[in-house]
Curated annotation (Swiss-Prot):
Residues 1-19 form the signal peptide. O-glycosylated. O-mannosylated by POMT1 and POMT2 and elongated by POMGNT1. N-glycosylated. InterPro entries: Galactose-bd-like_sf, Suco/Slp1-like, SUN_dom. Required for bone modeling during late embryogenesis. Regulates type I collagen synthesis in osteoblasts during their postnatal maturation. The lineage of its organism: Eukaryota, Metazoa, Chordata, Craniata, Vertebrata. PANTHER family: MEMBRANE PROTEIN CH1 RELATED, SUN DOMAIN-CONTAINING OSSIFICATION FACTOR. This is SUN domain-containing ossification factor. Glycans are attached at residues 202, 236, 929, 956. It is a single-pass type I membrane protein. It is found in: Rough endoplasmic reticulum membrane. Residues 207-219, 241-255, 272-287 have a biased composition (Basic and acidic residues). One of its GO terms (cellular component) is membrane. The modification Phosphoserine is found at residue 1082. One of its GO terms (biological process) is positive regulation of osteoblast differentiation.
Length: 1253
């Protein structure tokens, strides 16, 4: 326990610090000392939540700790255990919620759960306190707001502004707000049913961003309650609620990119697409910024322009032709009530008027002021742009009223769309029928209103510059803010919408304001009449449009009830006039309102005050009426009850009295018809404007009762049958409806001629109804009072006598043609009831027929007229508004077929548009196209410039890249060229080398071939020489062998010197020893000698005794042969000698030299002979004669030695070879050349070297 207490204290301190640092999370309010305990208890519970957060990882310890902490917190409280339980449960959850707002979702999942059963029980216990809690706190804090808090928990956002302000509101509410707040905040986990039941409305109202219906919210709460035991499930439920709330908010979110800006950087749109986008954007801007700038500000000026009477003598109009019986035809073009065109009724009356200038016809006015005469009933109007012509375009058949006032017939743009735009200058009028049975049918006045070419140009020009002339808006408050917005939405482009708005405004102005100008010219009576005419259409519009007043709905119901009522027979003329069921029903409701305020002028003044207040509060009607919602409901109920009572009375009276009660129900029907047209199309502002004018007219009527009576009549007269066709706009519709009802009423009154007593009954019923309603005058709203004003004027007129009767009859007639004929004829009423209101145009003819059949027995005087109408087709067309409407359309179709063959051609070539308008339209179109094209081109230029800049940048980048690549390519090319040049150089070198090699190879081949040839030749020569040598050798050897063998002694002993000498002498051989013979075993030659020289060295051995016997010989100087060149090694070895002999001593020492004594001829000296003998003796060879020839050869030998010293080596080699040979046989030539053999002398032991022999 101590550990838990310490932890609890620590956690409480941390929670207090966190609350101090973040006061927006501090939900608890401490306002007094009494609330301090709950404050601390909540802090402790918050501490519990923080402790759970700190010890989140220890899941096994969370639940016991929470339980213990809750017990401890309960011990601190001084409140009853039930309250403690309640507060503990919700404060813990509250702290969890606030902690969850700063924790992530996984952290939130670890929080401990709260028992849903305990919560529900605690809620039941404290339900009373909860119900009594302040509504502000409940409205401010709701499950949805908690969901928002949880939804924003990830970003540590505490709460929404409304949620952060909750503590102050709770504190203001009182001390109980603490518990209430704690109860309300955790409602997303498990919301108590009591809270759900009580505060759903507050939730839906307080949270405009997230509106949830009660059923949806309860279903969500039930889901959350089912999952209340599990925190994860609770979180899942909250997630689902978040998703659903986001889904609720999605539909109201506006996509900022819904209107695509014309500037798309990526794609350049075409001119048409761009133009459409720009026009749409401009249209939206104009509608959002200036909703009333679509034609309102300049409407009055346009109306004044259009109020020119182009059939007036003042401007140059004249009568071109007329029936021959007509007198003073030009009088109808003069604004003088005392002048008139006179015609007997029996003749066919017609006339042709040339207008001042070509115009677009907008309205006709016709009047007959003469008392004792028949007024025109039906007349046909034809138009043409040239005269004379045999092709008149039938504009239509118009139905007048039996009234001696100006009757206006404005042309509906929808119905007369084929003709309104045509510029015509000639009008032909044919009177088809008339009211009454007087002899003369005079005509006092005819007016033609329209738009000339210049006016049309000015209108369109002004309409295009409305946005630029905002300073004029303040001048015209009569026009509503939303005036003509519907038309602008329907129009395809701004120009078309402007033109349509202008034309519609012109027509509306002609219908509404045109009467005032006419009144000014005519006088007080005409003024009052026109005023009332204008007020009637406005009255029903105002009543139908006002939001707080539910009169239109009730009026619709009323209409249906009237349809079901038993009909009473009415005069036939009245029924056809009121053929439009919708219009009649719509008119009936205003008449009912008028009946309520009929008898009192005080009601008029009060209604005036109400109208003023409504005009001033036109923009704040909802605000003005919120405070009096209960009053509004009370008044609405009272009005409905009064109308129901009146309706029931009229039904009963109609059953009692067939003709008269029939008049009563028509009064109601008139009322309905007046109210319903505005309910369909009229705007609030239109109502306000009309109410304003109505109030003004009513004031004038209050001051002039007589004028009022006339005005009532005029009101009934003005709406002619053409108006029954719904005019182009809501404003047009309501005046048409009213005028129709009034016209029909007037016709019915005239037809009813002598039924005035029957009309008194409806007046009385209306008075009674007024009395009943007077009991509850406060119950009516301002709109109802305004209508009361209008009706009071009518009541005053009714009080005047016959005029009143006429009015009542008109109401009756307009109200129920349907209810009257069903009584008489059962099938027709069934058909009319079965046919819907939308098919009113089709049902009208049938209604008219039935009315004729029913009415004929009722009114005797009207029978002949009805028969006349039925007899002629034109009259049949003119029977009534319903029948004439259908016939009128058929007639219009026929006329268009006759005139054009195709109605669409009217807008084509046959339709003549003014030169001004053609030029203006083309100029405007060109201006628009130029401006748009200029903007488009400017935008294109900007885009083009941007694109060009981007392209230039890209181009520069590409250029840089190309430059880099080119530079790199150039470098690569340079390197490649260098490599190529290097390779080329190497190739040239290679080619040169190859060429040189080829040349050298060729030369080598040549040399080789030459050498081969030389070798071959040398070989051949060698072979030849060898052969020759062999042959010579063979011959020489054979010869030498023969000679030698033959000449040599066969004994082996040497001959004696004497014998030898003798033999020499015998052979006569003369020899000369050039060299002293050296007796030695070897001899070395160092020089070279010619191979032809033969050196024979023979060792001679003589005994000393023989030496003595020898003859003396002459000693010669011994010459030593010195080699000029150094000794070279010989192949077979060196010549071996004892010692080289250098001088005589050496030479002598080596052997003894003997000089042969030659006995020469006597002529020679003894020395010579001795020498010769010695030589011969020495030689002893026959073949060596040249060596022993004598001393004559000595010099020659010396010279030869000198010459041949260069050849010593070769000779030495040969000598070596010869010396070394030891064999006794003679070497061959080959052996001698190679030096491989030693030549010896056989047995003699003398080594001989033989050269070339």
């Amino acid at each position: 326990m101590k550990k838990y207490r310490r932890a609890l204290a620590l956690v409480s301190c941390l929670s207090l610090c966190s609350l101090v640092w973040l006061p927006s999370w501090h939900v608890c309010c401490k306002e007094s000392s009494s609330a301090s305990t709950s404050y601390y208890s909540q802090d402790d519970n918050c501490a519990v939540g923080s402790e759970d957060i700190q010890f989140q990882k220890k899941n096994e310890r969370e639940e016991p700790s929470n339980a213990k902490v809750s017990e401890k917190s309960n011990s601190y409280l001084t409140i009853s255990p039930e309250e403690n339980k309640l507060k503990d449960d919700y404060t813990v959850d509250e702290c969890k919620i606030w902690k969850q707002s700063k924790l992530s979702l996984p952290v939130v999942e670890a929080l401990p759960t709260v028992d849903s059963h305990e919560e529900s029980s605690s809620v039941v216990v404290g339900s009373e306190n909860i119900e009594n809690s302040s509504s502000s706190s409940t409205s401010e804090t709701s499950p949805i707001s908690k969901l928002d808090e949880i939804e924003n928990s990830g970003t540590l956002s505490v709460a929404k502004p409304g949620d952060t302000e909750q503590p102050e509101a709770d504190c203001d509410a009182g001390e109980a707000a603490d518990a209430d707040a704690s109860v309300e905040q955790p409602a997303f986990v498990s919301a108590p049913e009591s809270l759900v039941g009580q505060h759903i409305e507050n939730v839906s109202s307080s949270h405009g961003k997230e509106k949830v219906t009660k059923s949806e919210f309860e279903s969500k709460v039930s889901v959350s309650e089912q999952d209340g035991g599990d925190p994860k499930s609770a979180l899942n439920a909250s997630d689902t609620l978040k998703n659903e709330s986001s889904d609720y908010t999605k539909p109201r979110e506006t996509d900022p990119t819904s209107v695509t800006s014309p500037k798309d950087p990526e794609d350049i749109p075409t001119f048409d697409e761009w133009k459409k986008k720009v026009m749409e954007v401009e249209k939206e801007k104009s509608q959002s910024l200036h909703p009333s700038s679509n034609g309102g500000p300049h409407a009055t000026k346009k109306v004044q322009k259009n109020r020119n009477n182009y059939a007036s003598v003042e401007c140059g109009a004249k009568i071109l032709a007329a029936n021959p019986e007509a007198k003073s035809t030009s009088a109808i073009l003069i604004e003088n009530m005392d002048l008139y065109m006179l015609n007997p009724c029996s003749t066919k009356i017609w006339f042709v008027i040339e207008l001042c200038e070509p115009i677009q016809v907008k309205q006709f006015d016709i009047a007959n002021y003469e008392l004792f005469s028949s007024t025109p009933k039906d007349f046909l109007v034809s138009i043409s742009d040239r005269y004379p012509t045999n092709k008149w375009i039938k504009l239509g058949t118009f139905h007048g009223r039996d009234e001696r006032t100006v009757q206006s017939f404005p042309l509906d743009e929808q119905m007369y769309a084929k003709y309104v735009k045509m510029f015509i200058k000639y009008i032909k009028v044919e009177l088809l029928s008339h009211f009454g049975s007087e002899h003369f049918c005079p005509l006092s006045l005819i007016r033609v209103f329209g738009t000339s070419m210049v006016e049309e140009y000015e209108e369109i020009a002004d309409s295009q510059y409305q946005s630029e002339r905002q300073e004029l808006f303040d001048e015209d408050y009569d026009y509503p803010l939303d005036y003509n917005t519907v038309e602008d939405k329907s129009s395809k482009n701004l120009l078309g919408s402007a033109t349509n708005a202008i034309l519609n405004m012109v027509n509306i102005a002609a219908n509404i304001l045109g009467a005032k100008t006419e009144d000014l010219t005519e006088g007080d009576k005409s003024i009052s009449e026109n005023a009332t005419a204008t007020t009637e259409p406005k009255m029903p519009e105002s009543t139908g449009v006002s939001t707080p007043v539910p009169s239109p709905e009730y009026i619709i119901k009323e209409v249906h009830t009237h349809d079901t009522e038993p009909p009473t027979s009415d005069p036939p003329k009245e029924s056809p006039i009121v053929q439009l069921v919708q219009e009649e029903e719509e008119e009936a409701s205003p008449s009912t309102v008028t009946l309520l305020g009929s008898g009192e002028q005080e009601d008029e003044s009060s209604s005036w005050f109400e109208s003023e207040t409504q005009i001033l509060c036109s923009e704040l009607t909802s605000i003005c009426c919120i405070s009096s919602f209960s009053e509004y409901l009370y008044k609405w109920c009272s009005v409905r009850i009064a109308l129901y009572r009146q309706h029931s009375r009229t039904v009963s009276k109609g059953k009692d009295v067939s003709p008269q009660p029939s008049l009563l129900p028509p009064v109601d029907s008139v009322e309905v018809s007046v109210l319903q047209p505005p309910s369909g199309n009229v705007d609030k502002e239109d109502m306000e404007r009309e109410l304003e004018t109505v109030a003004l007219d009513d004031l004038s009527s209050v001051h002039q009762a007589h004028v009022r009576n006339h005005t009532v009549d005029t009101v009934e007269l003005e709406p002619s049958y053409p108006q029954t066709l719904s005019q182009s706009l809501p404003l047009d519709v309501t005046p048409e409806m009213d005028s129709l009802s009034t016209v029909e009423g007037s016709e019915s009154v005239k037809s009813e001629g002598g039924h005035k007593p029957s009309q008194v009954m409806p007046q009385e019923s209306s008075v009674e109804f007024d009395d009943e309603t007077e009991k509850k005058p406060e119950s009516f709203s301002s709109v109802a009072k305004l209508s009361v004003i209008y009706e009071t004027s009518k009541v005053n007129e009714v009080m005047d006598g016959p005029v009143k009767e006429d009015i009542v009859s008109t109401h009756v007639v307009t109200k129920f043609p349907e209810t009257k004929f069903p009584e008489t004829v059962a099938p027709p009423p069934i058909n009319t009831a079965a046919v819907p209101e939308s098919e009113g145009m089709e049902t009208k003819p049938s209604l008219a027929d039935t009315l004729k059949h029913v009415v004929t027995p009722v009114t005797d005087p009207s029978l002949p007229e009805v028969k006349e109408d039925e007899q002629s087709p034109d009259d049949a067309l003119l029977r009534g508004l319903q029948r004439t409407a259908t016939d009128f359309y058929a007639e219009l179709q026929n006329s268009t077929d006759l005139g054009y063959g195709n109605g669409n051609l009217v807008h084509g070539s046959n339709q003549k548009e003014s030169v001004f308008m053609r030029l203006n339209n083309r100029i405007k179109a060109l201006e628009v196209n130029m401006s748009l094209s200029g903007r488009y081109l400017e935008e294109l230029s900007q885009r083009y410039r941007k694109q060009m800049e981007e392209m230039q940048k890209a181009f520069n980048k590409t250029i840089v890249k190309l430059q880099n690549t080119s530079r790199i390519a150039e470098e690569q090319d340079q390197r490649q060229t260098e490599a190529i040049h290097l390779l080329q150089a190497q190739l040239t070198n290679m080619t040169q080398i190859v060429s040189n090699l080829s040349a050298t190879v060729a030369e080598l081949k040549r040399e080789v071939s030459d050498r081969q040839s030389y070798l071959v030749m040398s070989l051949v020569l060698c072979v030849v020489l060898g052969l020759m040598l062999c042959m010579q050798r063979c011959r020489n050897t054979s010869q030498f062998d023969g000679d030698y063998t033959s000449k040599l002694p066969k004994s082996n002993q040497y001959p004696s010197p004497k014998r030898c000498f003798s033999s020499y002498d015998d052979m006569n051989l003369k020899r000369r020893t050039s060299f002293p013979l050296i007796r030695s075993k070897s001899l070395q030659f160092t020089g070279k000698e010619d191979p032809n020289d033969l050196y024979i060295v023979e060792p001679l051995k003589f005994s000393p005794e023989k030496k003595k016997k020898r003859c003396k010989y002459k000693t010669e100087k011994i010459e030593t042969i010195k080699p000029a060149d150094p000794l070279h090694p010989i192949a077979n070895g060196d010549i071996k000698g004892r010692k080289p002999f250098t001088n005589q001593r050496d030479f002598s020492s080596m052997g003894e030299v003997y000089h042969s004594s030659y006995k020469g001829p006597p002529s020679e000296g003894s020395s010579e002979t001795s020498s010769q003998s010695e030589e011969s003796y020495f030689c002893g060879i026959s073949a060596c004669t040249s060596l022993c020839n004598g001393q004559t050869q000595k010099t020659k030998l010396r010279r030869g030695l000198k010459r041949r010293r260069s050849k010593v080596q070769d000779q030495g080699k040969l000598i070596k070879a010869l010396i070394q040979t030891k064999s006794g046989s003679l070497p061959s030539l080959h052996d001698i050349i190679k030096g491989n053999k030693e030549i010896t002398v056989g047995a003699f032991g003398v080594t001989a070297v033989s050269g070339h022999i």
